[in-house]
Each structure stands twice: as C-alpha cells, then as structure tokens.
C-alpha cells in the first residue's frame, strides 16, 4: 500500500490559500489530499507541457504542483485560471 505524499507549500502558495474564502480553501485542501493519495491519476492532476510540474483544477482556480522524490508534493502556485499560466 502506498502512503500519501507529504504536502508542502511554498510561501506564496500558502499566502494565496489563506487569502481565499473558507469554502474554496476547503475544496483546494480536499483536492490536495486526493492528489497526495494518487498524484498520477489524471482525475487528480495532469502534466503541464514543457515543464516538470502538474496542474490540478478546483473550480476557477489552478494549483501548480511538483512531485519531489521520494514522498513530497510541493505546492508552487494557487491562482485563478486566467493568471496562473502566465507565471510558468
């Protein structure tokens, strides 16, 4: 049985998460739990072309992630869809 990955946030992602309303914050945390449990499942996240990052969708928000070995999921960016891909 595979253990879920440890989820770590960089400073800007943590700040973005805390700035969101409570229901959206909960939905994002739930999605991160699902990604940590099975990060390569296409229902949870998908690879971004030209990078080593993955993206997860929660409503109008996108979460950019990086799977770090051996058991860490780094949350890089949490932003609205219209803004997030400009920062890659």
Regions found by a protein language model. Give the residues of each.
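Residue-level signal for threonine
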Residues: 10
């Amino acid at each position: 049985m595979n253990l879920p990955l440890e989820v770590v946030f960089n400073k800007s992602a943590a700040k973005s998460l805390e700035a969101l309303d409570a229901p959206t914050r909960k939905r994002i945390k739930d999605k991160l739990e699902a990604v940590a449990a099975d990060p390569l499942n296409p229902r949870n996240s998908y690879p971004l072309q030209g990078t080593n990052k993955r993206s997860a969708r929660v409503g109008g928000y996108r979460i950019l992630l990086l799977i770090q070995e051996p058991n860490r999921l780094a949350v890089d960016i949490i932003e609205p869809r219209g803004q997030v891909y400009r920062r890659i």
